[in-house]
UniProtKB/Swiss-Prot annotation:
Residues 271-300 form a coiled coil. One of its GO terms (cellular component) is phosphatidylinositol 3-kinase complex, class III, type II. It is a peripheral membrane protein. Component of the vps34 PI3-kinase complex II composed of atg6, pik3, vps15 and vps38. It is found in: Cytoplasm; Golgi apparatus, trans-Golgi network membrane; Endosome membrane. The gene is vps38. This is Vacuolar protein sorting-associated protein 38. It comes from Schizosaccharomyces pombe (strain 972 / ATCC 24843) (Fission yeast). Belongs to the VPS38 family. Keywords: Coiled coil, Cytoplasm, Endosome, Golgi apparatus, Membrane, Protein transport, Transport. Involved in endosome-to-Golgi retrograde transport as part of the vps34 PI3-kinase complex II. Mediates the interaction between atg6 and the pik3-ppk19 core complex, leading to the recruitment of atg6 to the membrane. It comes from the Eukaryota.
Length: 474
C-alpha cells in the first residue's frame, strides 16, 4: 500500500482547519486598547469595541469541478477558530479525492455588519507559502495573524498571508511543532477581554430590560385584577337580572304546559278519528290492489297476444316479400353473372349501354318493389318515392336550398343531373335498409346487387330478430 508523501494535499484526507488570529487588515488594531493612552481615548476605544463587536467567521470549501461550495462550516466567534471534519463530512468529501487542488474561503462579520469574503487560500502542492510543521495541530505560531493551519492524514501544514511570509522565512521549523512556541504580542486589551466586557455590558442591559419588564408586568397584573373585579361585579348584576327573567319565564312555561295539555287532549281525539279513516282507506286500498292484480294479468295476456301477432305479422311479411320477389325477380344476367336484372330488364348507368326505355322500366319496377317493401316492413323511406311505372319520381326532403324537390327516375329528361341525383337518392334508400339490418354494403352504387342481398336476408327469416317485440311484466 503506497503512502501519501508530505505535500500531497487531497480534500478527502482533510481532518481539521484552524484559522489563527483573524483580523481585518485595514482594522488590524481596532480592538488594541493601549493602557498608556489617557483615560478619554481608552474610553472611546472601548465604546467602539462594544458597538462594533467581535469578529465572527465561517469557512467554505470549494473544488474546481463545482461552482457551489462542497462544504460550509458553522459560524464561530472565537479568536482562533478550529473547524473539525467529522466522519459524515469525510464520506461526503471522498468523491472529490481526485481533484488537483481545493480552495478555502473565510467569511467574516462583526455584530453590526453582514458577512463578507475575508480571504481565499488555494491549497496546491508545492506552494511556497504552505509549509509542513509536524503532526500536532495544537501547537502553532501564535504571533501570526490570519494564518491557516490544515491537518491532513500525513501531518499539519501552515499557510500564511504575504504579510507574515517574511517572518515565516526567518523561522526554521523542527520536525515536530510540539516543542515550538513563540509568545504572541499582546495589546492592552485582548480579544478575550473585550469579549468579556461586551458580554458584561450585554448582561447589564439585559438586567435593566428585565427590571422594566418585571415592573410593567406587575403593573399590568394589577390593572388586570382591577378589570377582572369590575367584570365580576357586572357579571353578578347580570346574573341577578337573568335569575329574575328565569323566574318569570318559569311561570310562563307552567301556563304553556297547561295549554299544551288541553291541546293534547284535542289532538288525541282527532287522531282517533283519523285512525278510523285510515282503516277505511286501507280496506279501499286492498280492493284497489286486487283490481290491479286482475288488470296486470289481463295486460300480460294482451302482451303475449301482441307478441304472437307481431310474430305472425313478421311471417306474413316474409310471405309477402316472397311473392314480391317472384313478381319482380332479381337474377344474374345470363351473359354476365356480375350484373343483375329485374324481370329480365338490365339496369346499368354506363352511357349508351342500354336504351332509355329499358332503363326507365327497370327503375320503375325497382322503385315499386322498394316502396312496397317499406310498407310491409313499416319503415319510412328517407326519400319518398312517387310510383308511376316508367315515369316514377323521388322526393328530396333533406337537402337544403335546392330549386326543386322532385327528381325523375327516368333518363329521358334534361338536364341529366336531375336523373343522376334521383338514382343517388334511390340508392340511399336501399343502403338505409341494409344498415337497418346490419348488412354490409359491398358496392355502394350496385343497386340491384344490394337489393338482392336485402331480399335474401328477409326471405331467410333472419329479420325476425329485428322485430321490436315489447313485453310488460305485471
Amino acid at each position: 500500500m503506497s503512502l501519501e508523501l508530505p505535500g500531497n494535499y487531497r480534500l478527502s484526507r482533510l481532518k481539521s482547519i484552524q484559522i489563527r488570529n483573524v483580523q481585518e487588515i485595514q482594522n488590524h488594531s481596532k480592538f488594541a486598547i493601549n493602557t498608556t493612552e489617557n483615560l478619554w481615548k481608552r474610553d472611546v476605544q472601548l465604546k467602539r469595541a462594544i458597538s462594533e463587536g467581535t469578529i465572527r467567521i465561517f469557512i467554505s470549501l470549494h473544488v474546481q469541478s463545482k461552482k457551489l461550495p462542497v462544504y460550509i462550516t458553522e459560524t464561530s466567534g472565537n479568536a482562533n477558530h478550529i473547524f473539525y471534519v467529522d466522519e459524515k463530512v469525510t464520506e461526503k468529501l471522498q468523491k472529490y479525492r481526485h481533484e488537483e487542488y481545493f480552495i478555502v474561503r473565510t467569511w467574516c462579520s462583526s455584530s453590526s455588519h453582514a458577512f463578507k469574503l475575508h480571504k481565499e487560500w488555494k491549497i496546491l502542492r508545492y506552494d511556497s507559502n504552505f509549509r509542513y510543521i509536524g503532526n500536532d495541530p495544537v501547537f502553532a505560531v501564535c504571533h501570526i495573524r490570519n494564518g491557516l493551519l490544515c491537518e491532513f492524514n500525513d501531518g499539519v501544514y501552515i499557510y500564511t498571508t504575504s504579510q507574515s511570509s517574511d517572518i515565516m522565512r526567518q523561522t526554521s521549523f523542527p520536525k515536530s511543532a510540539s516543542t515550538y512556541s513563540i509568545d504572541r504580542r499582546k495589546d492592552g486589551y485582548t480579544i478575550q477581554k473585550i469579549t468579556r466586557i461586551l458580554k458584561l455590558a450585554e448582561c447589564i442591559d439585559e438586567m435593566h430590560i428585565a427590571k422594566h419588564e418585571i415592573r410593567a408586568h406587575f403593573q399590568e397584573e394589577e390593572f388586570q385584577q382591577i378589570r377582572l373585579m369590575h367584570k365580576r361585579m357586572l357579571l353578578r348584576d347580570e346574573k341577578i337580572d337573568e335569575l329574575a327573567k328565569l323566574e318569570h319565564l318559569w311561570q310562563k312555561q307552567i301556563n304553556s304546559i297547561t295549554q299544551m295539555r288541553t291541546k293534547f287532549d284535542k289532538t288525541k281525539s282527532w287522531l282517533s278519528s283519523k285512525r278510523n279513516t285510515l282503516n277505511k282507506s286501507k280496506e279501499s286500498l286492498q280492493k284497489d290492489e286486487a283490481e290491479y292484480v286482475e288488470l296486470a294479468n289481463s295486460l300480460k295476456t294482451k302482451v303475449e297476444t301482441n307478441i304472437e301477432i307481431r310474430i305472425l305479422m313478421a311471417h306474413a311479411i316474409r310471405m309477402h316479400v316472397s311473392h314480391l320477389s317472384k313478381i319482380y325477380p332479381i337474377q344474374p344476367s345470363p351473359g354476365n353473372h356480375d350484373e343483375f336484372t329485374i324481370r329480365n330488364l338490365r339496369l346499368s348507368f354506363e352511357p349508351d349501354k342500354i336504351n332509355n326505355v329499358e332503363m326507365a322500366a327497370s327503375i320503375g319496377f325497382l322503385a315499386h318493389l322498394l316502396q312496397t317493401l317499406s310498407k310491409y316492413l313499416e319503415k319510412e323511406l328517407a326519400y319518398p318515392i312517387l310510383c308511376a311505372s316508367s315515369r316514377s319520381s323521388i322526393l328530396d326532403t333533406l337537402t337544403p336550398d335546392i330549386p326543386t324537390r322532385i327528381f325523375p327516375l327516368y333518363p329521358a329528361t334534361r338536364p341529366i343531373e336531375l336523373f343522376e341525383h334521383a338514382i343517388y337518392l334511390l340508392n340511399q334508400d336501399v343502403n338505409d335498409f341494409l344498415e337497418t339490418f346490419g348488412l354490409p354494403i359491398d358496392q355502394s352504387m350496385d343497386i340491384l346487387r344490394n337489393f338482392k342481398k336485402l331480399l335474401q336476408f328477409i326471405l331467410s327469416g333472419q329479420h325476425l330478430s329485428f322485430v321490436q317485440v315489447t313485453s310488460t311484466a305485471p
